[in-house]
């Protein structure tokens, strides 16, 4: 039996959020085949661990039913989620992880089991790059262009020492690790290009974010009102103003429609913009729902026809929300800044891309109506095969073999 160790770095795997849905649940599909076992190794800071102890224990019990073992390695509060891992913090970081990774290294040498490490983040991957000897066991699951993201939001200086360090580490990870997973071909191409690395599809694998389609089919869709939906955080990448501006533009031409927003962002970050006088005309047609549990999301999706992902800065990823929209039978509307999603919307004919901010509203509304009528002719079934969680064992088997 093959063994997979999912490595999580000071992130809440127990909150049923992204790590649970995008890392744990897909690997559970392999466990269910009877040919794999799964351990979760979490480097968790002591304050974080103590604060969330009850939730952690509950998740342990739930996953125990599948034979999943969770190992929490307690470390001091260190610069990952709450303090960015700049070069000045590296000695502190290495001090925290060194003994744990060396322990894993010695333990793995004594077994004949076929072992893989699925590394969740750049921060976790760095420790294994430095201290774990057998790099052929490591699958690096990038998820996001972490370095570029921190440059774009101003956390890292483009030519600073921190970026130079991480660029060099990234190249070593790409070359030395067994495989690296990317969630869009544009993301993969951009990362390989900046390091002048030739594409090898067996080593640099394309794996889209998986979604449980059945979860979003639990409530029947009622899209007669042509409502628009946005789900997710509102901050650096997705600003509430860009969604309000879009709806303000089309609202008069679609008088029965609403804009529905489900977000985990705090109300004090949204209300000042939402209450601006420019949005007076649409305010009573906008619903904002805070901290909606994942189990309740299908009821909001079911009220909508279109799913929005409009960003002010360029990004090569394909976000979870884009695939959730597809799973719920919504029509995604993205702009060209959401490059990975825009490419898929065109390739599979499953959404529309707003190429030009000056596009006339009549043109936008006509395109929305056209794709709504023609969606049965799209390549939705083909897209589902590569994104449905329940089909994901077939995608992951060649990677973890």
Language-model segments: residues:
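Membrane-proximal helix-turn-helix segments that form the acceptor-binding/catalytic region
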Residues: 26, 95-106, 126, 140, ...
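Conserved donor-binding/catalytic core segment of Leloir-type glycosyltransferases
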Residues: 6-8, 181, 220-238, 243-251, ...
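Nucleotide-activated donor-binding/catalytic signature segment of Leloir-type glycosyltransferases, i.e.
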Residues: 263-265, 271-296
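Acceptor-binding helix/loop patch of EC 2.4 sugar-transfer enzymes
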Residues: 76-88, 136-171, 189
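A charged, aromatic-enriched C-terminal amphipathic alpha-helix characteristic of glycosyltransferases
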Residues: 355-363, 369-401
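Nucleotide-sugar-dependent
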Residues: 238, 293-300, 305-326, 334-343
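N-terminal subdomain of nucleotide-sugar transferases
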Residues: 1-64, 112, 245-254
